[in-house]
């Protein structure tokens, strides 16, 4: 988030008449509930799936459906007069993690619970073979700027838990009136079942190489 934000900050101070610019700022994808954010069999009841996150009892994080993400990108190019000079922060919903099990149960009929853990506890789920490995496989080498998976994703969770995320929901509704507006709606539309399915190439490549 920091590295991309620095690029966006640099772009945002450019003269938008001499160089028309727009920034599309996203968040985690709802589809990552199939992968990095997928539920696991609960330790107390293997028949129940546990959605695990270090967000506290009522913490939330923004998620966006990839289908709508592409439509927002198309809007940026189709409406240059409105999008010029705009950093459009998009999301489908500010998702309270403790509410996901109820949405999942309603969409699938399956039992689920929310488990709040520490950031270190989240890494103990084994999502990354080595959480302390440097993140950025395409970089030519470690120049002192690369961060570990623990630093990178730990920063994500701490920022979201802080409650400082702000979105212009009215603008997103105006741009895309038929957008997906809740994780429950996305689950029903995508026939989500809680099973792990590949999404991010880099994520699976790293697990294969480990």
What are these model-predicted stretches?
Residues 49-52, 125, 164-167:
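Surface-exposed beta-strand-to-loop junctions
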Residues 88, 101-161:
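Terminal hydrophobic/aromatic helix or amphipathic segment near a protein terminus
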Residues 1-111:
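Oxidoreductase cofactor-interface core, primarily capturing Rossmann-like NAD(P)-dependent enzymes
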Residues 39, 159-162, 206:
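Surface-exposed polar/charged interaction patches
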Residues 167-210:
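Amphipathic terminal alpha-helices
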Residues 14, 76-80, 107, 153-163, ...:
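Generic recognition of well-structured, leucine-rich alpha-helical segments
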Residues 70, 101, 123, 184-187:
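Generic structural signal for individual residues within well-ordered alpha-helical segments
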